[in-house]
Amino acid sequence: MSNSNNDSRRRGLEMERRAADWLASHGLRLVDANQHARRGEIDLIMRDGDTLVFIEVRHRRDARHGHPFETVTAAKQRRLIGAARFYLHRNGLSCACRFDVVGVTGTPPHLSFEWIRSAFDAF
């Protein structure tokens, strides 16, 4: 893997960690992170009460190239849904679920977080 890919992956993991901390400060509890399935990857899996929340974290340094939410396309949503179904099946879970998206803008330590609960429907 090239250095730029390693740097991008490292930055992505850092933003996911920061988003998990931010969401925890808003009452969610981390269950799992970076879950891979054949159809995609789930950045964060958290609990909001009895609801299992699959969370996509998107980061942009600034809005010059669009808002982070704009990168969650219909194709990306389908991959997330497939990965979530695999996760539920693999873990024998049957519970209320939702898909959230967290947009992170800026560079540390000046980050702005935006959170869309129930960003799209799946089940």
From Swiss-Prot:
It comes from the Bacteria. One of its GO terms (molecular function) is nucleic acid binding. SUPFAM superfamilies: Restriction endonuclease-like. NCBIfam families: PRK12497.1-3 (NF009150), YraN family protein (TIGR00252). Belongs to the UPF0102 family. This is UPF0102 protein Csal_2201. The lineage of its organism: Bacteria, Pseudomonadati, Pseudomonadota, Gammaproteobacteria, Oceanospirillales.
